Amino acid sequence: MRFGKIEYLNLLPFDVFLKGYRTSNSFKSTCNYKKSYPAKLNKEFLFRRIDAGFISSIAGMNAHYKAKACKAGIIAYKEVWSVLVLESSPASDYQSATSNALCLVLDLKGAVLIGDRALKYHYDSKHTNSKSSHFQNSTLKHNKPSKYYDMAKCWYDKTGLPFVFGRACFHTNDTFYKNLIQDFNHKLGQGKRYKGVKIPHYILMPYVKKIGITKTFATKYLEHIYYKIEAKEHHALTLFYRYLRIKGIKAPKRF
């Protein structure tokens, strides 16, 4: 079994859960091997180089309608901090298909920035006096954070719904992956903000240092993210897919 994971801070609770989950060591090692950014995992999934994984919501559209998607994803309500559109020349982010599509759905103009790079950008914008503010990106030719939009907030303003940025989908081993995600949801507990998965200091700190943020900021960021897909999140996905059809935006394909 080959499971792919998005290598961002927002999936750290799942990583911690998986470490203590009763399954084979070979499966766990495969999960650590198949880690990358969303757009790369989309290709891995579409070409069946992985059996399952957390992939972009737009790439999971077929899985959504074919009952090949689990009830867990990477979800934000009102704010996300790590999916931004910067006031700059229009530019897509090579790491994400969903966020690029969402930018078009929301009629936003600017440069799309996602993941830990976007989180660092947001952090720097809130700490403009910090000496560590030295964001660099090939899309943007300046270091000083400019005005930007949080796409989860823009989506909420438009629909009143949360947004599902990524989703756990599978090709094979349906029962195993459904049980895995069901156990993950059960471990998390009830409510958006409550997480039954406690992240140890020694696991969190390497991410904090790598991104260039504080532990407090990282903890607050994770409070903006939740994972369980229920009726409202399912409706948000269906609405997003409807907007894609209206806008003529195609989901990623193998060829």
Regions found by a protein language model. Name each.
Residues 1-255:
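Domain-level signature for soluble enzymes in the chorismate/prephenate branch of the shikimate pathway
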